[in-house]
């Protein structure tokens, strides 16, 4: 397969995901297919965003890493110290992705490391490993292209997260401001009663304890639910199950006391 064909295969995957978050497992699988390598896509803090492994699955240590979804802290630091592509690293180098304890099995292995950059900052690392055969110039071109594309996708996801947080905060602020004084007081007592972000509420008990009517509690919950801040489900005589949908709601409620 030519370099152009391999690049197009990666592009095809990205076009399928246009407008939605890319699954980095799929990206790792595609990179593995076109480069015939074991692949790790790792965040700057060592979280495994995506991987596609073949020979490396023989290692118990690698299996444990996949289960934890993290690579060791020491190796993460070593990767973050790599500022530009380093290719054809052998098994005796501390940057090898292959387990040194299995040196005999991976004696001819080669590791290549591609820093993932975006927006002027280091976002993570693309690590490719082969049991044998050096990485050639075409492999390096493809790897650097893949690292660039991954960087763009990570930045896009970060941007989407920031936008979502802003929308959520606006929705929470509007919902809290829509409550009357007594409704706001009722909500504060409800979440004190729940002691967390979800739980079972018996409205009549809260109403009696605080000295407000049950209708105030019902109206307050209805306003928050219509704003998408909470969800509630009646369980009949048992009460009402309540769950917070917006992560920052309780923090904002505390600030508005």
UniProtKB/Swiss-Prot annotation:
Biological role stated in the UniProt entry: DNA-binding global transcriptional regulator which is involved in the adaptive response to starvation and acts by directly or indirectly controlling the expression of numerous genes in response to nutrient availability. During rapid exponential growth, CodY is highly active and represses genes whose products allow adaptation to nutrient depletion.
GO molecular function: DNA binding; DNA-binding transcription factor activity; GTP binding
Gene it is expressed from: codY
One Pfam family of this chain: CodY
Gene3D superfamilies associated with the record: 3.30.450.40, Winged helix-like DNA-binding domain superfamily/Winged helix DNA-binding domain (1.10.10.10)
DNA-binding region: 203-222
Transcription found in the keyword field: yes
Keyword DNA-binding listed: yes
GO annotation terms (biological process): negative regulation of DNA-templated transcription
Intracellular or extracellular location(s): Cytoplasm
Region ranges (GAF domain): 1-155
Gene Ontology cellular component annotations, sorted alphabetically: cytoplasm
Keywords (A to Z) from UniProt: Cytoplasm, DNA-binding, Repressor, Transcription, Transcription regulation
Transmembrane residue ranges: none
Major location (coarse): cytoplasm
Protein name: Global transcriptional regulator CodY
Family the entry assigns: Belongs to the CodY family.
């Amino acid at each position: 397969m030519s370099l152009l064909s391999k690049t197009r295969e990666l592009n095809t995957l990205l076009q399928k995901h246009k407008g939605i978050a890319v699954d980095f497992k799929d990206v790792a699988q595609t990179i593995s297919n076109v480069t015939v390598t074991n692949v790790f896509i790792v965040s700057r803090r060592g979280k495994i965003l995506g991987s596609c492994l073949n020979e490396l699955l023989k290692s118990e240590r690698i299996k444990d890493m996949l289960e934890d979804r993290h690579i060791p802290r020491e190796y993460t630091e070593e990767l973050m110290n790599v500022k530009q592509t380093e290719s054809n690293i052998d098994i005796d180098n501390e940057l090898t992705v292959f387990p040194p304890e299995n040196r005999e099995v991976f004696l001819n292995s080669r590791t290549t490391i591609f820093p993932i950059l975006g927006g002027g900052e280091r976002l993570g690392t693309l690590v490719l490993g082969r049991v044998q055969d050096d990485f050639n110039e075409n492999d390096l071109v493809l790897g650097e292209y893949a690292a660039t594309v991954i960087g763009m996708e990570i930045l896009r996801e970060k941007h989407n997260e920031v936008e979502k947080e802003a929308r959520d905060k606006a929705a929470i602020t509007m919902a809290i401001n829509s409550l009357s004084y007594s409704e706001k007081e009722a909500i504060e007592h409800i979440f004190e009663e729940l002691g967390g972000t979800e739980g079972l509420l018996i409205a009549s008990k809260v109403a009696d304890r605080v000295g407000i009517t049950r209708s105030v509690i019902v109206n307050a919950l209805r306003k928050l639910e219509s704003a998408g801040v909470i969800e509630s489900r009646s369980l009949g005589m048992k009460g009402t199950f309540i769950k917070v949908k917006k992560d920052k709601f309780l923090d904002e409620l505390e600030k508005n006391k």
